[in-house]
């Protein structure tokens, strides 16, 4: 069984064939984290012997050493001097809790979370631990789900007010793990607009370290993920303990190293600017967190997260399907287009084997620049005299699918919607509004706003008979205040916004099950498992420069699979960086994502169009392997100027290897690149050259990479097993 309970020892053992996660009740009251790692039969060591420090007995604030015990649901105020998972302000103003074991339940399957995205789990098994503070009546349900086929534990917490007076949550995290600080380093993903998810590894030191967002979105600046390991951890060797979060709003991911070298790792909703009132009988559900253990380094960790996402988080028609090759008109035309120009671009796209034409920003209201019309999702008849329906009919008539851009969460001050409902935006009455990109944020905590968005977006999708939607969000939140909440509940706005967003996404994606949805947030500003639950892919970054995309996509692959990464071939010089890279390189890098084009095809010479046609044929033939193969990082752009990665089929009979140089250097010899994931006993043929290599040879000696000729040269190899 995946979950075993020993009543004599009061031990819960969550397990599959590869991992164990063990919880022990101490004194019959406190759930203690005893072990997490490689599969074991049992742990007999006494956690009390290990965690008691006799020299500090005189300073203990509790009958048990809560300040040193590795707790599953720690709280501050009754002996533990570290920050905890939960903080509840009670009617008398105090916040101390003494959460003690009350009961437990072991369930087949994995319950869904009401109002929140979560991983499916028909084959999983779930432990629910119920704890209670007798003084206040606050009760907690800790849920742990273990899967048979992936080395991930899904966790969440539900808080219930069973008392007689209202209480206020001021912190409610999703997961906490106390680990021995043999994990000497922390890896996170940080960045900014146009350089999202850069890999940052730092030594763990006493005190707090981690990543967070206070922006109302998971953000360009941080990703809700962190990984702990020894300093000897590599991509393929060493133990890694990682936490990630299925949530799209402000978050907090933190490791605190205490005076005893215990590392407390926690992740969940950002406590800053958060509170939530629970009246008697009310409950609060936290987002879901994922705890991943890998004995095979960071690559092993990534593949577990990729399997979690692909098998259990993404949903719908496109979760495991090939994706249409698209061209997006944004960098081809920006706001300056008409129907004739769009049809010219679409006709050219059809000629080179593209499947989907996407109309980006500027089709609605009177939006000739970015300072108007958001919220007015009505056709601009100046640009589209036949409306969306007329354009869509013509695009479909060419044999292409038709896609459309929206930014439904935003409102322009210069819009009919704002003139009719100025109170619908997030704002503080009496204060000057702070615009970003000339826009304000709609208040998704309000039912009437959510209903308007669902109806307006659905109507436009139906008019345009769309096959694809790009759902954008180009600014973060500030000036936090909702006219729909009283003064005592304003700190609920951030989370209520995200709950409102999820309600909208559930409604729209359910209404249009055959439409491919791609999320976007000024590029990769909301790239998280929460959005993946509703939309199987996300625009990875607004930066389409191939060399910078190597870093962005390499970092993104730490947590998210190739099938989620929106990646396009764009024009040169690149519109964000001014850099020029070869077409073959731009294509090779875009094949590390969902693949598409973001340029004016009508301006390209015949030779480039012919090359694009050949590339599209190649991508379509290889797409199942590229999107859904086992992904391995081989050479890090964060450790030099070169990047390499590969995808291997599940049966290990086929692989695609990509290597990208940085700026060329003189007098360099060809490189040897050791591969991963192949069958050591098989022979593999390079489809292009016809050369045959042994799998063991490729994984030890390596594959020869030709020396660079020109800056940013890419080389790809398609390897197929020889029968």
Regions found by a protein language model. Give the residues of each.
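Active-site neighborhood of glycoside hydrolase catalytic domains
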Residues: 385-387, 425-580, 594, 599, ...
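Short Pro-Gly-centered flexible turn/kink motifs
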Residues: 88, 96-101, 276-295, 713-720
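C-terminal beta-strand-rich structural cap/linker in extracellular carbohydrate-active enzymes
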Residues: 695-723
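Conserved, mostly hydrophobic/aromatic
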Residues: 18, 157, 281, 327, ...
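Carbohydrate-binding surface patches
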Residues: 235, 637-679
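Glycine-rich, aromatic-flanked loop segments that form ligand/cofactor-binding clefts
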Residues: 70-72, 77-109, 233-251, 292-317, ...
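Polysaccharide-binding surfaces and accessory modules of carbohydrate-active proteins
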Residues: 5, 9-13, 17, 31-256, ...
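Aromatic-lined carbohydrate-binding/catalytic grooves of carbohydrate-active enzymes
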Residues: 318-455, 468
């Amino acid at each position: 069984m995946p979950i075993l309970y020993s009543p004599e020892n009061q031990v819960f053992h969550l397990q599959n064939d590869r991992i164990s996660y063990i919880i022990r009740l101490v004194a019959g009251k406190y759930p203690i984290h005893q072990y997490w790692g490689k599969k074991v039969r049992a742990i007999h060591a006494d956690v009390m012997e290990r965690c008691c420090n006799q020299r500090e007995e005189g300073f203990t604030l509790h009958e048990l050493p809560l300040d040193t015990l590795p707790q599953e649901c720690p709280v501050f105020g009754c002996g533990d001097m570290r920050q905890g998972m939960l903080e509840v302000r009670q009617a008398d103003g105090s916040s101390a809790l003494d959460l003690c074991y009350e009961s437990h339940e072991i369930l087949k399957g994995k319950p869904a979370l009401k109002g929140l995205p979560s991983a499916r789990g028909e084959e999983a098994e779930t432990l629910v631990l119920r704890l209670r503070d007798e003084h206040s009546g606050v009760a907690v349900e800790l849920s742990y789900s273990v899967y048979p086929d992936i080395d991930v534990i899904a966790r969440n917490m539900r808080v219930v007010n069973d008392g007689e007076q209202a209480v206020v949550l001021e912190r409610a995290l999703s997961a906490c793990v106390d680990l021995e600080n043999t994990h000497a380093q922390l890896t996170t993903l940080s960045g900014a607009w146009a350089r999202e998810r850069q890999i940052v590894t730092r030594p763990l030191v006493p005190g707090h370290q981690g990543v967070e967002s206070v922006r109302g979105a998971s953000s360009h600046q941080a990703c809700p993920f962190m990984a702990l390991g020894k300093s000897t951890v590599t991509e393929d060797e060493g133990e890694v303990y990682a936490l990630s979060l299925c949530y799209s709003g402000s978050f907090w991911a933190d490791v605190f190293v205490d005076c005893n070298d215990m590392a407390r790792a926690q992740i969940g909703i950002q406590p800053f600017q958060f509170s939530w009132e629970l009246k008697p009988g009310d409950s609060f559900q936290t987002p879901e967190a994922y705890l991943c253990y890998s004995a095979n380094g960071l690559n092993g960790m990534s593949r577990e997260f990729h399997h979690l996402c692909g098998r259990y988080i993404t949903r719908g028609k496109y979760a495991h399907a090939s994706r249409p090759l698209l061209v997006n008109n944004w960098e081809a035309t920006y706001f300056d287009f008409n129907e004739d120009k769009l049809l010219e671009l679409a006709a050219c796209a059809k000629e080179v084997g593209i499947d989907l034409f996407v109309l980006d920003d500027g089709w609605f209201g009177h939006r000739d620049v970015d300072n108007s019309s958001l919220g007015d999702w009505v056709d601009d008849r100046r640009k589209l005299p036949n409306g969306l329906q007329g354009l869509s009919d013509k695009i479909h008539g060419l044999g292409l699918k038709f896609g459309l851009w929206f930014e439904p969460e935003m409102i322009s001050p210069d819009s009919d919607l704002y003139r009719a409902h100025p109170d619908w935006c997030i704002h503080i009455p009496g204060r000057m509004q702070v615009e970003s990109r000339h826009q304000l944020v709609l208040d998704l905590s309000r039912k009437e706003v959510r209903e308007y968005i669902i109806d307006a977006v659905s109507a436009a999708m139906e008019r345009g008979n769309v096959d694809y939607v790009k759902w954008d969000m180009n600014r973060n939140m500030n000036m936090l205040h909702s006219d729909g909440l009283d003064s005592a509940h304003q700190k609920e706005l951030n989370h209520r916004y995200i709950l409102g967003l999820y309600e909208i996404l559930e409604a729209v994606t359910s209404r249009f099950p055959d439409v491919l949805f791609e999320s976007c947030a000024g590029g990769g500003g909301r790239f998280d498992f929460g959005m993946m639950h509703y939309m199987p892919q996300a625009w990875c970054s607004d930066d389409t420069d191939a060399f910078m995309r190597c870093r962005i996509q390499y970092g993104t692959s730490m947590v998210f699979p190739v099938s989620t990464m929106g990646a396009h071939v764009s024009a040169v010089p690149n519109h964000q960086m001014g850099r020029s890279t070869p077409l073959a390189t731009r294509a090779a890098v875009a094949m590390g994502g969902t693949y598409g084009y973001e340029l004016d095809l009508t301006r390209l010479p015949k030779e480039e169009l012919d090359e694009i046609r050949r590339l599209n044929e190649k991508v379509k033939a290889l797409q199942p392997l590229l999107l859904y193969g086992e992904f391995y990082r081989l050479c890090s752009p964060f450790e030099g100027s070169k990047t390499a990665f590969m995808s291997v089929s599940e049966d290990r009979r086929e692989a695609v290897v990509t290597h990208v140089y940085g700026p060329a250097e003189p007098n360099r010899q060809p490189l040897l690149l050791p591969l991963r994931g192949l069958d050591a006993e098989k022979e593999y043929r390079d489809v292009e050259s016809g050369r045959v290599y042994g799998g063991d040879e490729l994984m030890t000696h390596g594959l020869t990479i030709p020396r660079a000729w020109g800056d940013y040269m890419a080389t790809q190899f398609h390897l197929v097993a020889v029968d």
